[in-house]
Amino acid sequence: MTDPIARHPRGILVACAVPWDDDERFLEPLFRQQVRALVADGFPQQYVFGTAGEGHAVDTPRFRAVTTAFLDEAAAAGADVMVGVIGLSTPAIVERLAIAHDLGARAFQISLPAWGRLADAEVDRFFDDVCGTFPDSRFLHYNLGRTGRMLTGADYARLVARIPNLVATKQATGSQAHAEDVLRLSPELAHHFDVDLFPAAALHGPASLLASYAPLSPRRIHDLWDAAERGDAAALARMQAGIVALSADLWSTPAPGPHMDGAYDKLLLRIGVMPGFPLRLLSPYQGFTEDDAVRCRALMEAKHPDWLPA
């Protein structure tokens, strides 16, 4: 399913988590292995430094080191990658983007500054100043509630008219009505929806998939995408019900705690395609524990073995 007015091809987008040792040093060989493994599993569209990749927590030396390794390994593995930047102001975001741009990146993921909710004029100025600084690059907007403002279809329609290199979005949260709204009012953009919303979103238009469960079960993610490509509403409904049940079981298993997105992604890697992946997050954020990983793996083997890698 393609759209002749789309600025960016649809596809499956997958996050790369960043492994740290006990002293919070970058484990580059393991990170490179992850990039290669995702490509081998059929996921060449990858990004780093969203919330899952700890873009909110990383300092500049780590940002530079990870970005350098990411771009180098992507080129060798044939991955189509983007680098995320999270910051509290336009100058801070542009500064980080410039580092990645100098290293060779030409596709970026950005989110609104989160210190205060932006008004319409401030949203427009942010995209003008950020995207306009790098006219040779493509931008995906990471739309999430913790920025204080979720952009709507009308917001995106306004931005499409003024920002030619805004090509995609990542809709981390939202309802089915929100999915229909952004797909209908801004079809020029490739809108990526996470696994829990994608089955419903795909019934409203040419949705892309943000595959947070890809490290757990590449096969099931490809099945989900294939059902959407066929327009198989019955299969999508069954799969959505299965995803809801899986998520309820899996995320009620670990001990409770204030876990950031990266904690979940690292746990999925650990119990999925990369059993040795470390669970640590950069300070001050709390990751899952080794006991959590053991319990979650046992839960998957007992109740959802069809979601585990072959």
Pin down the residues of each PLM region.
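C-terminal alpha-helical cap/extension of soluble enzyme domains
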Residues: L13-A17, D41-G42, G205, R220-A310
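A structural signal for short hydrophobic/aromatic patches embedded in well-ordered alpha helices
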Residues: V66, F126, L159, L236-M239, ...
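Hydrophobic alpha-helix position signal
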Residues: L38, A100, A201, L268-L269
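Active-site beta->alpha loop and helix N-cap motifs at the rims of alpha/beta catalytic domains
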Residues: T2-R149, R158, Y285
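Alpha-helix N-cap/helix-start motif at coil-to-helix transitions, marked by capping-box chemistry
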Residues: R7-R10, P215, H259
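Catalytic alpha/beta core domains of metabolic enzymes, predominantly
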Residues: C131-S137, L144-P254
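Residue-level detector of family-conserved "landmark" positions at structurally sensitive sites
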Residues: V48, G84, I110, A211, ...
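A general structural signal for well-ordered alpha-helical segments in protein cores
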Residues: T67, I93, A179, P218-I221, ...
